[in-house]
Amino acid sequence: MNYDHILIRFGEISTKGKNRRSFIERLKQNIRLVLKDYKKVKYFSNRDRMSITLNGENPEEICSLLKNIFGIQSFSLAIKCESKLEDIKKTALAAIEGEYKPGNTFKVETKRAYKQFELDTNAMNAEIGGHILKNTDGLTVDVKHPDIPLRIEIREEATFLTIRNEKGAGGLPVGSAGKAMLMLSGGFDSPVAGFYAMKRGLSVEAVHFFSPPYTSERAKQKVMDLAGCLAKFGGSMTLHIVPFTKTQELIQKQIPENYTMTATRRLMLQIADRIREERKALAIITGESLGQVASQTLESMYAINAVTATPILRPLIGMDKTEIIEKSKEIGTYETSIQPFEDCCTIFTPPSPKTRPKKEKIEHFESFVDFEPLIAEAAAGIETITVYSEQEAHDKFAGLF
């Protein structure tokens, strides 16, 4: 079937009242960014939905990209025709003929936004259904569980016919809720946390701490690949790679062993907070889940958080590890996260980390060490790169070879 349009229905945007227009504009910008290589498409929007005119572009390719865009509740490939009965009948029959097999069932559902149309909804359903039955073989009606639900939307300017309704990613358009920094390691948790933050409308930049030679270039590439996995939900992702070797070596030398993990997390948070301020973000995102590991007890979080007044967002706080892993499989980060290249946190994990550290104690231990020069040095040596989704990166560099 030659589909010529895609109809896009909004998710939570429909509840945003006075801010509705800005949310729709943000979603439109995000869709344009993701579909920027499809030069022929045109966009139209109103209060209830958006439509894309394909103008010959590949509909299946575009649909596969739309599935990852937050703010879309659902979308459908559609055929457009004039709002005239004979045109609708002809188009409906062509749509069914392109989909059905003998033995299939179908149902016609009409939405008549154009109230001056010559037939009402029930009469239209009967008219179109009768026309299809008369001109096909082996097709019957099932109004409860049809194989082919033919939906007809009649508007004054045009009529749209759809058959398949695809589920969208839901949530809010990326960037509609502001910007935050994601502390991105190479594990399962932080990429999933980044996904959920983006789903709630946050524009996310990632911060990764890199400690060569203790961590390898492969570990660095692993994190870049994870950022690329997340980039498909926002078009691209900015990744800040922080040199952390000297800071970790000083921690190991000067801080009691069972408090090294707490000190490491506190210093990471301070550096991430400086990057956040420079990048004009308003929060920091972590992949912490309450009680999952020693650094994620409530006492640890309290002692670590004390170094900043910046909001710390923890999208996974109530999730089990198995739930997080299942989600990582769903969003496409699992296969990268299982690669056996350790990050700086796992390399320097003490044998018996303090699970209930005291804020006063870690502050006492840190008071004997001047970390500020190393924090400044790490901040000055940050490598900032833009990471694209796997497909976009392939397209971007394909012409070079």
UniProtKB/Swiss-Prot annotation:
A GO CC term attached to the entry: cytosol
PROSITE patterns named in the record: THUMP
Stored SMART domains: THUMP
Species for this entry: Bacillus velezensis (strain DSM 23117 / BGSC 10A6 / LMG 26770 / FZB42) (Bacillus amyloliquefaciens subsp. plantarum)
Top-level taxonomy: Bacteria, Bacillati, Bacillota, Bacilli, Bacillales
InterPro entries, per the entry: Rossmann-like_a/b/a_fold, ThiI_AANH, ThiI_fer, ThiI_N, THUMP_dom, THUMP_ThiI, tRNA_STrfase, tRNA_sulfurtransferase_ThiI
HAMAP family: ThiI (MF_00021)
Domain THUMP stretches: 60-165
Pathways involved: Cofactor biosynthesis; thiamine diphosphate biosynthesis
Protein's name according to its UniProt entry: Probable tRNA sulfurtransferase
Record's keyword annotation contains Transferase: yes
Gene that encodes the chain: thiI
